[in-house]
């Protein structure tokens, strides 16, 4: 114990942090900073959001009390949080082309490749092991959206960007197309000195473009109206008034990021695991609707898409096909699903069928 105390007192933590930064770059992280383990002001903002019921069915957001804003409650002894960024930017032109092609399926960019949770967790674990190699055993916990944590607030405090009006983190040199992850540590690492100020100014492009008006105020997202929530987290029937605005977005939505002026500086990712799988960046609605449950499970293995489940996958596709142009193939696909054993699938297939038929009569 005495040796450990002496080692701690004589540790050059700035030199250690410099080494951590270098190793993080080698592991594919595109930004890194250190935040203090205190987020009480952000906890108040979260609680107000919860009190308004704007988290929808995401009951897990209301659990754990102050644990999100008190990292030391989640990982005992936490003194500082290493926050990292990994870019997943791609060509915006293809995204717009898909959105403007009603018969095509739009899958949010982050979900086209391998599940980022698994990839980043592995890389963060390797970063923690590097630290252990440098200084010996220390207490830490790796997080990638896997425990109660205010990751955007931590990243902001670590100097990685500011929280934009669409509630995503923005870096003035890299935009907002990136994932976040953390290592909670008991090391007194030097804190990031620069806390980026907001640079959204009077811009409201993200608010204006939202198909369902889910951004109800700057920095305020009503998840109950958000297409990402509706197509991924929400279980059961999608409110009927929100189905048409969903368009052909079958898993998530990127509109608020696609229009953000800061994303002209976004970096195109160089991570092979983020490349689109199973042709998901140019698949037709009909092709995906034809997947059996076995095909869905097989083709979404290792993908974030599996989170939504097969029933909600069919539900989302039924809505999207209903929003497409009427064709014999679209009508036939929906008609087949009106006999599906699940009532949610039947309901949305029937809605889509009525919508296509109304377009034919118009």
Identify what each model region corresponds to:
Residues 10-199:
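Auxiliary alpha/beta "docking" domains used to position bulky ligands
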Residues 29, 205-229, 249-273, 333:
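Iron-sulfur cluster-binding cysteine motifs and their immediate structural context
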Residues 239-273, 298, 302, 306, ...:
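C-terminal amphipathic alpha-helical segment
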Residues 296-299, 326-338, 359-362:
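Amphipathic alpha-helical scaffolding segments comprising HEAT/armadillo-like alpha-solenoid repeats
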Residues 306-308, 336-344:
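Short coil turns that connect the paired helices of HEAT/ARM alpha-solenoid repeats
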Residues 313, 344-346:
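Positions within the helices of HEAT/ARM-like alpha-solenoid repeats
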Residues 317-318, 349-350:
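Conserved hydrophobic register position within alpha-solenoid helical repeats
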